[in-house]
Amino acid sequence: FYYINPREFVNKKVCLDREKSSPFECGFDPLEFLSYPLFIRFFVITLIFLIFDVEIYLLLPMVYLNMSSP
């Protein structure tokens, strides 16, 4: 999200440097097309996290039940 700064219109010295005038987004160029391998890598990491999260969610009650039974 980029908001329009009114000082940019009033200031006569306009910064024409692309690096300084663009927002910083974790090293990514916001005007450049995002490559698919990066998206797929984050998608795979998210799926692995969800699988382990659901596994812990399902196995933790079984551990508590086994500990409480004589």
Swiss-Prot record:
Enzyme class: translocase
Transmembrane segments: 42-62
InterPro entries reported in the protein's UniProt record: NADH_UbQ/plastoQ_OxRdtase_su3, NDAH_ubi_oxred_su3_sf
Keyword Transmembrane on entry: yes
An example molecular function term from Gene Ontology annotations: NADH dehydrogenase (ubiquinone) activity
An annotated GO cellular component: NADH dehydrogenase complex
Catalysed reactions listed for this entry: a ubiquinone + NADH + 5 H(+)(in) = a ubiquinol + NAD(+) + 4 H(+)(out)
Domain of life: Eukaryota
Compartments it resides in: Mitochondrion membrane
Family matches, as Pfam families: Oxidored_q4 (PF00507)
Keyword Plastid: no
Recorded topology in the membrane: Single-pass membrane protein
Keywords: Electron transport, Membrane, Mitochondrion, NAD, Respiratory chain, Translocase, Transmembrane, Transmembrane helix, Transport, Ubiquinone
EC number(s) on file: 7.1.1.2
Family recorded in the similarity comment: Belongs to the complex I subunit 3 family.
Function: Core subunit of the mitochondrial membrane respiratory chain NADH dehydrogenase (Complex I) that is believed to belong to the minimal assembly required for catalysis. Complex I functions in the transfer of electrons from NADH to the respiratory chain. The immediate electron acceptor for the enzyme is believed to be ubiquinone.
Protein name: NADH-ubiquinone oxidoreductase chain 3
Native organism taxonomy: Eukaryota, Metazoa, Ecdysozoa, Arthropoda, Crustacea
Gene name linked to the record: ND3
